């Protein structure tokens, strides 16, 4: 069991210092991190950068564990929904070049112009088409619990059941369930048979936290083991179920991202 690092964990550094994907790979190499998750949102020009990044990963002995996209099917415009599908389709050859067989996907964002029922139909339609294409390439799409459309365990399970594809599973984000006022262990009871990818994240309840739940509770991101998520029990239950996929750190705390990442890796070592 090894902890992979999502590039999202340094998203503030990327924004503030103009980091490229290659800069992230260099950071991981210096930190001794041997597994990474890359995201399509961080490419400046994927066609140009990808071969260089693949070569850098190989030369530094770093393995990509997964790839992630930020598609949104909750659009009342058919062309926008097609663009969301294309975003996933375009990720398939990138994932193959990186040597990964898991792509994290989203459902979409609920807005005042879109009803839940309409959005659910569009999400199912889009993910079904995407999963069919991914399956032909030997890749599994993993739907993250994120936002209001696929935020709870029951919502994610409903989408997976309707798509009904062996190539669409769950990215179990340990922290995001708190933002829809659901205990992560409760969600795990619902999804444990569907989990093929884990985003390891911790949140703590704080009055001035930046992240608000649907009920108005404030949370802040912290290093693993410093928050309210029972990460040790999640790992125990997944191990008992035979889970052998990746655990991917998504650090979303304040302060130094590098230090938050280091503390998270130290904590993860106590779970081994």
Tell me what each language-model feature is.
Residues 1-97, 118, 165, 169, ...:
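N-terminal pre-domain/capping segments
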Residues 1-32, 124, 150-172, 176-272:
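Histidine-acidic metal/acid-base catalytic patches
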Residues 7, 61, 68-71, 104-109, ...:
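Short, small-residue-rich loop/turn micro-motifs
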Residues 10-12, 40-45, 70-75, 109-110, ...:
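Short histidine/acidic/glycine/proline-rich micro-motifs that form metal-
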Residues 26, 58-63, 75-170, 179, ...:
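Active-site acidic/histidine proton-transfer and metal-coordination neighborhood
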Residues 37, 66-68, 104, 142, ...:
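Conserved beta-strand positions in the central sheet of alpha/beta enzyme cores
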Residues 72-76, 111-115, 216-219, 249:
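Short amphipathic alpha-helical segments at helix-loop
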